[in-house]
């Protein structure tokens, strides 16, 4: 199974899903659910910048995919009353690509660069003076005839988004005045998001139905909205169109998403640790071979959520199952089963 096949992946499935996501996005900070600290900070910073009639400081948003970094970039531009230009690190292959974007910005506009950690070194070098001095240094000509030309730029706000903050160079990171880490959402926050999205999609849903979807959404709004749409399909075909807890549970079981938000691949990994390696520790290469997956898939796709939720522990000796993992699968640890009298005198 690859990441794009998983219904609980935090990455968008397709351009069609991105269109649906845009329709569900909040457009102002007051409508944005979750990330309370970031939201309050941005309210203050944006209002201060507007009062001074200045561009907002450059903003770096980082955290797991699907948590709302792109949404926040759009909200920042809307709250500032300016235009937003959207691009991504891999698209900006040459210095000229970035120069074309920068020279077309208007005063105080927002330039949003997704996957900013994937900028090439050449493009990144051009970005430094643009961020600091609102100037573009470009080389014209070649060889001995080459000369540097400075072009003044309008003041602007760069909003960078990344899931891999550790891959940013220090010089780039240091040029952001506002740095915010987005965290996984609580079930209560996701319930509000599901309820709001259901209203926009004209879906009849009860509070406990929204809660059931929220609890299995891995702390991620993008997953919550995707599950809502799939549960809606189930409700229209197998029920009366109304989503309550029972309908949501039946639909999510059909989709192989269990009560903890784990799917087939998550369970395959955890059961391998439990059954093939006695709960661990096990090295990631051995684990990858045991479940026939790539090492990168385990480290970048599966582990973050499992570790964050307490199902997996990363130690110097390898990966280990936790007490929660044994309880989730109703499996008795080997050492406990071997000495029943110690734990269960009966």
Curated annotation (Swiss-Prot):
GO molecular function, one term: four-way junction DNA binding
Main location: cytoplasm
UniProt keyword annotations, A-Z: ATP-binding, Cytoplasm, DNA damage, DNA recombination, DNA repair, DNA-binding, Hydrolase, Nucleotide-binding
Positions of the UniProt region annotated as Small ATPAse domain (RuvB-S): 186-256
Pfam families xrefs: AAA_lid_4 (PF17864), RuvB_C (PF05491), RuvB_N (PF05496)
SUPFAM superfamilies (alphabetical): P-loop containing nucleoside triphosphate hydrolases, Winged helix' DNA-binding domain
Stored InterPro entries: AAA+_ATPase, AAA_lid_4, DNA_helicase_Holl-junc_RuvB, P-loop_NTPase, RuvB-like_N, RuvB_C, WH-like_DNA-bd_sf, WH_DNA-bd_sf
BP GO terms, sorted: DNA recombination; DNA repair
Keyword DNA repair: yes
Gene Ontology CC: cytoplasm; Holliday junction resolvase complex
Stretches for region Head domain (RuvB-H): 259-346
Span of the signal peptide: none
Binding site for Mg(2+): 70
Family to which the UniProt record says this protein belongs: Belongs to the RuvB family.
Assembly description: Homohexamer. Forms an RuvA(8)-RuvB(12)-Holliday junction (HJ) complex. HJ DNA is sandwiched between 2 RuvA tetramers; dsDNA enters through RuvA and exits via RuvB. An RuvB hexamer assembles on each DNA strand where it exits the tetramer. Each RuvB hexamer is contacted by two RuvA subunits (via domain III) on 2 adjacent RuvB subunits; this complex drives branch migration. In the full resolvosome a probable DNA-RuvA(4)-RuvB(12)-RuvC(2) complex forms which resolves the HJ.
The protein, known as: Holliday junction branch migration complex subunit RuvB
Source organism: Nitrosomonas eutropha (strain DSM 101675 / C91 / Nm57)
